[in-house]
């Protein structure tokens, strides 16, 4: 168990409850409400070890590449898919997510596109819908 997983499980108690599903190697998109930067680490740490190696959280590049500790957690520990939130005419923000799915990895995504302190989710961005249509065999 990696130090980040051990620490997260000790501090937060990140253990999954599989309701209506069970752990499997099937490619999936896990999605959740996003209230804190810890959400990514907690969800990823709660997965069984064999699933963590091929499950990549989606994270905002501008936040996770700032500072050596964040960058190490994001890139070396979590193997995140970094998304540039700045709008660009020439770049499709979903392309790194598509690449991840084409490679056969599962993903953890927060479809609201940002953190929200309230427990009730806000409106989802269209990206998760587009990915579901483009990758119908992914659960």
Residue ranges and their predicted role:
Residues 1-8:
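N-terminal nucleotide/polyanion-binding subdomain common to many enzyme families
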Residues 10-139:
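Soluble catalytic domains of membrane acyltransferases
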């Amino acid at each position: 168990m990696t130090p980040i997983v051990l620490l997260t499980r000790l501090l937060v108690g990140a253990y999954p409850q599989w309701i209506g599903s069970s752990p499997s190697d099937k490619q999936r998109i896990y999605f959740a409400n996003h209230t804190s930067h810890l959400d990514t680490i907690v969800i990823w740490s709660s997965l069984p070890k064999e699933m963590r190696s091929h499950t990549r959280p989606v994270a905002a590049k501008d936040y996770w590449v700032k500072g050596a500790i964040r960058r190490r957690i994001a890139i070396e520990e979590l193997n995140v898919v970094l998304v540039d939130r700045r709008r660009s005419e020439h770049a499709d923000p979903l392309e790194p997510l598509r690449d991840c799915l084409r490679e056969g990895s599962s993903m953890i995504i927060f479809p609201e596109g940002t953190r929200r302190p309230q427990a009730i989710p806000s409106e989802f961005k269209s990206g998760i819908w587009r990915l579901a249509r483009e990758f119908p065999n992914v659960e």
